[in-house]
Design a protein with these regions (language model features):
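Short conserved beta-strand and strand-loop elements enriched in small hydrophobics
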Residues: 13-18, 50-66
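N-terminal helix initiation/capping motif
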Residues: 1-41, 104-107
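Short beta-strands and strand-coil junctions in structured, solvent-facing domains, enriched
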Residues: 44-46, 79
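A structural micro-motif recognizing beta-strand termini
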Residues: 39-44, 93
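C-terminal output/interaction extensions
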Residues: 80-107
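Short coil/turn motifs at beta-sheet boundaries
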Residues: 8, 31, 50-52, 64-66, ...
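Short beta-strand-centered aromatic/proline hotspots
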Residues: 25-28, 69-76
Length: 107
């Protein structure tokens, strides 16, 4: 049984993670009203993706609407077998109504 509260939308969106003053190119694999699953290239900053780390997620929806969401890392790991990418699950902190409405348009 799936314990998720919100429906996830499978997407493939270019994004940018902003952590302190560092910008990290990434790809969003799925989105929900309150969460995101993101993949980044492996980096020395992996330790900065520890649970509870606050991070900004910046991307553009297919509609053209730009989003900047404040997020909290829930989990992260280096993707096996070689650790060439990082997988990161994030909780969206106080998702704006405009984001929620735009997400519904992806259906």
């Amino acid at each position: 049984m799936d314990a998720r509260r919100n429906k996830r939308f499978i997407v493939s969106l270019e994004a940018e993670l902003i952590l302190k003053d560092v910008r990290i190119a990434s790809s969003i694999e799925n989105l929900s009203e309150e969460g995101a699953y993101v993949i980044t290239a492996s980096s020395k900053l992996f330790s900065d993706f520890a649970p509870d780390t606050c991070i900004e997620l910046k991307f553009q929806l297919p509609s053209g609407e730009k989003q900047r969401l404040n997020c909290r890392v829930k989990w992260s790991y280096k993707t096996p077998p070689h650790g060439l990418t990082n997988s990161i699950g994030m909780q969206i902190i106080d998702p704006p109504l405009s984001y929620k409405e735009s997400l519904k348009a992806l259906i």
